[in-house]
């Protein structure tokens, strides 16, 4: 099994979109190295601390699996009852989408932080995981 890891150098912007409003076959477009257009409203998510975004690719006998992970802290509560995809813009200006119109959808883990007495901010800690044949696909906003 061969494993590679892509880590974004820094996250400048995070936004969410409803999966149902995305174009079809994002994973296949990503494999073909075609940037995906995001033709719907992107809801910006304010964040604090340092978000992280990475994608681990495993190739095992011709089977490819990407696992993208996005971690960030925000004051905003996202609409968790809907299937959401995330548009991440790195500090180099390149944008990527995590998620697709079709299953599997990203899994959102939410932790509530009440902050510390020493001044750490209170808020919501999100960990988004998306496992597909291609995740963290370049996109146009």
Regions found by a protein language model. Give the residues of each.
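Homeobox/homeodomain signature
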Residues: 4, 60, 86-88, 126
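Generic "edge-of-domain/loop-turn" microfeature
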Residues: 21, 75-77, 93-95, 105, ...
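Short, acidic/charged, Gly/Pro-enriched secondary-structure junctions
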Residues: 71-101
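Mixed-charge, glycine-accented linear interaction segment located at domain edges/termini
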Residues: 103-141
């Amino acid at each position: 099994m061969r494993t590679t890891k892509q880590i974004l150098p820094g996250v400048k912007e995070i936004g969410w979109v409803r999966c149902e409003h995305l174009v079809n076959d994002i994973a296949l477009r990503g494999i073909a190295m075609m940037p995906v257009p995001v033709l719907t409203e992107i809801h910006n998510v304010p964040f604090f601390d340092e978000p992280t975004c990475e994608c681990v690719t495993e190739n095992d006998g011709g089977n490819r699996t990407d696992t993208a992970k996005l971690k960030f802290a925000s004051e905003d509560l996202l609409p968790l009852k809907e299937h959401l995809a995330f548009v991440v813009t790195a500090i180099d200006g390149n944008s990527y989408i995590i998620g697709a119109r079709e299953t599997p959808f990203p899994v959102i883990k939410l932790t509530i932080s009440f902050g510390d007495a020493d001044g750490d901010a209170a808020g919501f800690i999100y960990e988004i995981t998306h496992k597909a044949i291609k995740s963290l696909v370049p996109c146009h906003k």
